[in-house]
């Protein structure tokens, strides 16, 4: 008779969870940030709000974003005037778009990740799908399983309405699944489309306007598993994870799904709350490793906006190049919510290899990935790079 202990040992992987492939995708419609204020106020019939338009222009100028990608183009918006209004009942129209488009964009990213991984998709044992764009039953996880032709027995996890910290959450969950299920290969997909949050301007809800200046669409996929086979190419090891709610941060970032779509509410002090608490998170993560010089590790941080990055950089005394990959993704794509940190992970490994830096983490061995979002919730993932 086999004991429970023997069964448990046989079920568990030997080594740490490893990111084995990354794929990204965006809608084809690219929006230039410098001309976006004119377009946005025209398409929402708000050109009479001249002072607010000037304010929005300043927001866009300060955003450090050059361009974004959006599923919503002029043609779609003209067909759906309720989406362009500030607070018109429009949830049905928004839902109809995103329940179709979120899985499709996710499929694009997942297909790229599976191609890089190089293994048959029948070897995928688990699927984690994450989106803040639309809710349906069966969910986007089911739709993606069908679109990709995954096995019907794939074990699915659907994460809705997590927001901007969830790029860290999916890695934490994937790590636990990979390490506790020997031979597991976890496909992780984050797919975000701003059709749920797009709306016209108003001078009574400026935090909504901040969202209109920052958010973009994108999907990212990674494949995670422990004990890589010789044919698999590890990129990063997932060594340690944590999630915490910051003290005195209730209401700092809120989102509410209503008849008018998803409304966002931001307190001005979000950058202050994050920068004030970031060192504690780093100490908890890196003290056991004997690391206290935060310029000696590579960094991936959710780029909620330039003020967050600036204040974290100042608080920790970081060299400007530490945030290079993060700032690059913000500049080229905007804030894509949960997908952002996976785009940055992809950018970092590509630039590290291009520049001959020796490891996937800018030539360094250890790194950290941060997700920030509603709560205010912080996700921390300690990464170990791979020699290239």
From Swiss-Prot:
What SUPFAM superfamilies does the record tag this protein with? Thiolase-like
Write out the GO biological process terms. Answer: flavonoid biosynthetic process; polyketide biosynthetic process
Name the PROSITE patterns for this protein.
Answer: CHALCONE_SYNTH (PS00441)
Q: Which GO terms describe its molecular function?
A: acyltransferase activity, transferring groups other than amino-acyl groups; naringenin-chalcone synthase activity
Describe the function of this protein: The primary product of this enzyme is 4,2',4',6'-tetrahydroxychalcone (also termed naringenin-chalcone or chalcone) which can under specific conditions spontaneously isomerize into naringenin.
Q: What family is this?
A: Belongs to the thiolase-like superfamily. Chalcone/stilbene synthases family.
Name used for this protein in its record: Chalcone synthase 2
Task: Give the source species.
Answer: Glycine max
Q: Which gene encodes it?
A: CHS2
């Amino acid at each position: 008779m086999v004991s429970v202990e023997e069964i448990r040992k046989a079920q568990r992987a030997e080594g740490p969870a490893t990111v084995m492939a990354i794929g990204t995708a965006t809608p084809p419609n690219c929006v230039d940030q410098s001309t976006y204020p004119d377009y946005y106020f025209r398409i929402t019939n708000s050109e009479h709000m001249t002072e607010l338009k000037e304010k929005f222009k300043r927001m866009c100028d300060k955003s450090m974003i050059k361009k974004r990608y959006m599923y919503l183009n002029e043609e779609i918006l003209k067909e759906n005037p309720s989406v362009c209004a500030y607070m018109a009942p429009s949830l049905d129209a928004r839902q109809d778009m995103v329940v179709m488009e979120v899985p499709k964009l996710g499929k694009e990213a997942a297909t790229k990740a599976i191609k890089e991984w190089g293994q048959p998709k029948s070897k995928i044992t688990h699927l984690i799908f994450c989106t803040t764009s639309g809710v349906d039953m069966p969910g986007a996880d089911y739709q993606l399983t069908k679109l990709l032709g995954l096995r019907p027995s794939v074990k699915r996890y659907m994460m809705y309405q997590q927001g901007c910290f969830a790029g860290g959450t999916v890695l934490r969950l994937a790590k636990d699944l990979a390490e506790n299920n020997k031979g597991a290969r976890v496909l992780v997909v984050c797919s975000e489309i701003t059709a749920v949050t797009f709306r016209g301007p108003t001078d009574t809800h400026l935090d909504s306007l901040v969202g209109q200046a920052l958010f973009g669409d994108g999907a990212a996929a990674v494949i995670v598993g422990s004990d890589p086979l010789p044919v698999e190419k590890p990129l990063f090891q997932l060594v340690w994870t944590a999630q915490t709610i910051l003290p005195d941060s209730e209401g700092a970032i809120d989102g509410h799904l209503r008849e008018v779509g998803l409304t966002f509410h931001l307190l001005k002090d979000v950058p202050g709350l994050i920068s004030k608490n970031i060192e504690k998170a780093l100490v908890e993560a890196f003290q056991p490793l004997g690391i206290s010089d935060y310029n000696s590790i590579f960094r991936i941080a959710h780029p909620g906006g330039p003020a967050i990055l600036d204040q974290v950089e100042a608080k920790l005394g970081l060299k400007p190049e530490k945030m290079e990959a993060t700032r690059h993704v913000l500049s080229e794509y905007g804030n894509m919510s949960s997908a952002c940190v996976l785009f940055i992970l992809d950018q970092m490994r590509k630039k590290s290899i291009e520049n001959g830096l020796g490891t996937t983490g800018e030539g360094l061995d250890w790194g950290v990935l941060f997700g920030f979002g509603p709560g205010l919730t912080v996700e921390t993932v300690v990464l170990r790079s791979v020699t290239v």
